Every structure is written in C-alpha cells, then in structure tokens.
C-alpha cells in the first residue's frame, strides 16, 4: 500500500511491408492505496497515446473489474503502384478492311461495365493496336469500388481478391467518312489479388475472346457483328455466381426484310460478353 508502479509499453516495429506502426510509447502507472479499513484501491492510469489519458479504479472485494486498455493503432494498405506490384495492361488489335489505316484516326475507351462514362482518357490506334493506360489499384480504391457495386470479392487461396468488370469500346462519333464499325466493343475483367506484403497483382481476363476492334471502309455490303454486355449486380459482400450461359438474348427486326444474323439467339460468357 502507498506504492506506485510505473511501466512503459511500446510496439515493436518489424518493418513488415504495407503496415504502419504505432510509435507512441504508452506509460502505465498503478497506484495502490489503503484506506486502513481493509480495502485496497488500485488506480491504473494509461497515458502517452493520441487518445489521451485513461484511468480505471478497482477496489478489493469488488466482483466487477474494469480492464485497463493500452490501445495501439495499426493500418495496412496495398497498391499495384509499388515495387513488387503489378498493374493491369489492356491491349487490343485494331483492323480496317477496305483501305490502309492511319495511326490516330480511331479512338477507344474503357468504362466500368454498365457505366457510360469512360474510366480514362480515350486512346488512339497505333500500328494496328490499341494500348490503354495501365490500370492501377490500391486497397482504398478497391473498397470504394466494392461499395459502389463495381467490384466484388473473389478471395482465393487465403488471399484477398477482387474482380472488376469493364467494357472496352470504340468511340463511334466522328468516324472517318465511309467507315463503319463491325466489332466495336468487348467485355473483360480484371482480377486484383492482395499479396499481403503491401503489393497488389492485377491480371486481365478476356474470357477466352480475342480483344479486337474491327472497322470496314466502303459502300459495298459488309458483315456487322452485333455484340452486347451482360452485367450481374450482387449485393455488397456477396460473390456473384458464374453467369456463363445463364442468360439468353434474342434479336428481332422491327421491319420486314431487314438483314438478320444467322443466329438470332445467344447466351453470355463468363465476362458478360454476348
């Protein structure tokens, strides 16, 4: 009785990548008092952290004991934009039938599946290809996408993972004279895996299709590919089931004699392409 015991509590910084450590040293004092009537009182004071000072009091004979908490605060974040991280790179083939194609005369964008606004600035065709900006992610962005219904969790092998569906498309406004688009969009997904060391690995999945944009020049009859995208919205925290072949779509003509495809019904693939 009448004694005070003082302790310091500090967190060891192991330097694990992706983690932040709490470097504030907490001081814990325990003061013992005797009221000379047979009751001891222990007053515990915790100080030194950003939460301020917290005091708990316990008297002998009391059944309820309030624990003296010594809180430490840590956080974890990961990104593709760091050594060891991998961003997603989307590259498509661009063809023009009927005349030579000049670099920069066609423009292309990427949008979240079901969205109308381009995710990034439009990119031109160069050398028969379209190279989009790399798609970078971090854990905060993924959390926001999940909350907005644009990403869903697909954890695998004990690692956190997210899947984001996109549509790559050709900007059809301002096409050169005499040019029409036959294959102007395709769907794809990006799977982002948290490696647990502050890095994210983003991988593009084209769902087994060739990433391709096709245009035709000329007034003669041409074949046109009719494509679509199916988006399945799942509630936050739920992983949508595999939708391969689960939805059927039918093409009908509003006018008699209108050109029709050989197959007038089709189903979607795993990435939502129709």
Regions found by a protein language model. Name each.
Residues 1-274:
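Solvent-exposed loop/turn and edge beta-strand elements of beta-rich ligand-binding domains
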């Amino acid at each position: 009785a009448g004694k005070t015991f003082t302790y310091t509590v500090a967190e060891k910084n192991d330097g694990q990548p992706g983690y932040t450590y709490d470097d504030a040293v907490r001081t814990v004092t325990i003061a013992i008092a005797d009221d000379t009537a047979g009751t001891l009182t222990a007053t515990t004071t915790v100080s030194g952290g950003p939460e301020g000072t917290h005091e708990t009091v316990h008297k002998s004979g009391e059944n309820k004991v309030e624990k003296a908490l010594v809180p430490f605060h840590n956080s974890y974040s990961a990104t593709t934009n760091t050594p060891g991280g991998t961003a997603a790179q989307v590259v498509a083939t661009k063809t023009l039938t009927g005349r030579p194609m000049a670099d920069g005369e066609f423009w292309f964008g990427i949008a979240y599946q079901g969205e109308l606004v381009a995710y990034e600035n439009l990119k031109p065709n160069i050398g028969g290809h379209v190279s989009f900006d790399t798609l970078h992610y971090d854990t905060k962005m993924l959390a926001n996408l999940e909350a907005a219904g644009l990403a869903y969790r697909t954890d695998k092998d004990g690692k956190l993972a997210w899947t984001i569906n996109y549509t790559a498309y050709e900007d059809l406004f301002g096409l050169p004279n005499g040019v029409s688009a036959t294959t102007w969009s395709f769907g794809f997904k990006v799977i982002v895996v948290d490696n647990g060391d502050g890095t994210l690995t983003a991988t593009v999945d084209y769902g087994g299709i060739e990433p391709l944009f096709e245009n035709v020049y000329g007034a003669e009859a041409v074949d046109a590919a009719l494509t679509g995208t199916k988006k399945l919205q799942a509630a936050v925290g739920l992983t949508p089931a595999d939708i391969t072949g689960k939805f059927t779509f039918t093409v009908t003509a509003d006018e008699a004699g209108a050109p029709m495809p050989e197959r007038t019904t089709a189903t979607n693939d795993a990435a939502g392409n129709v």
